[in-house]
Structure formats: structure tokens, C-alpha cells
Amino acid sequence: MPKVTYDAIKGLVQKSGSGIELEGDIALTGGLTATGALSVTGSATLSAALIGSVDTRAEAGAVSLTKLTTLVTVTGGADRAITLAAGTAGQIKIIILTSKGGAGNAVLTPSVLEGGTTITFDAAGDAVVLVYTGAKWAVVSNIAAAIA
């Protein structure tokens, strides 16, 4: 498929390569769905909510790196060991313990954590917001979780 570019003066122009390239200001009415990565060079201004996808975890294991938020539930007396692999520099990850039934806690072990090695969630509502620095996960917000 040839590459199509839009130029404000020339209109649609066919070039070698593939994809679509748009230059100048673009007004979009309606929805836009991007499958795969969407890159924005420059500022992105949102006039409505930014809504990220959600991962739910009720068992031990790795939390999703491709979803913004992970909601964790714990039932029973045993701790839930959850892990978080290295991310991409600037990546944001939100983890919330939404429900707890029993004595067990959710214990998160990120690949590398600034200021500790684990984050323990022991009550519903405990939450952290993490940002990956390119070398480690940094806690930028913590609601009642224990970092050790």
C-alpha cells in the first residue's frame, strides 16, 4: 500500500512507503481507535477523561504491563505474590487492592523498585502509582501500602 500524506496546500499526496501521514492541525469529531502503539510528538491536550485499560488479578503471578491499572483481590489466609516486570521509560502503572477477604495480603515484587524491594497491600483501598524511570519503578503516589 503506498504512503498517503495530507498537506494543507496540496491535499492528499501519494508517496513511496506505507502508512498515512498528516501535517498541520487536525480536528477529529467522533472516535479514534488505534491498534498498536500511538505516538504523539509534541503536546497532547485532552478535553475529556483519559481512560486506561484494566487488568484484574485474583491469583499470584505477573501483573500486565500493557494495561494502565491492575485491580487486585485477595481471599483466604495466604499472601498473593504478584510481580511487575521492567517497563518502558515514562510508563505509568497503577495497582489497587480492591477487595480483601481473609488474612492474606497482596505482596508486589517489582523487577527493580526505587527505595525497596516489595510493596505490601494489606487493606482494601491500598494503592500505588508507579512510573518506570528506564532503570527502576519509582513510587510517585502511595495510599497506605507498605514499602520495604
Regions found by a protein language model. Give the residues of each.
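Extracellular disulfide-bonded cysteine-rich modules/repeats
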Residues: 123-134
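Beta-strand-connecting loops/turns
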Residues: 17, 90-92, 125
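Sterically constrained small-residue positions within well-ordered secondary structures
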Residues: 3, 86, 99, 120-121
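Short amphipathic beta-strand/extended segments with alternating polar/hydrophobic composition
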Residues: 21-25, 83, 122-123, 141-143
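Viral virion structural and adsorption modules
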Residues: 2-5, 13, 121, 137, ...
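Intrinsic low-complexity, repeat-rich intrinsically disordered segments enriched
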Residues: 1-68, 107-109, 113-116
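Exposed extracellular interaction/assembly regions and N-terminal maturation sites
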Residues: 41-109, 133-148
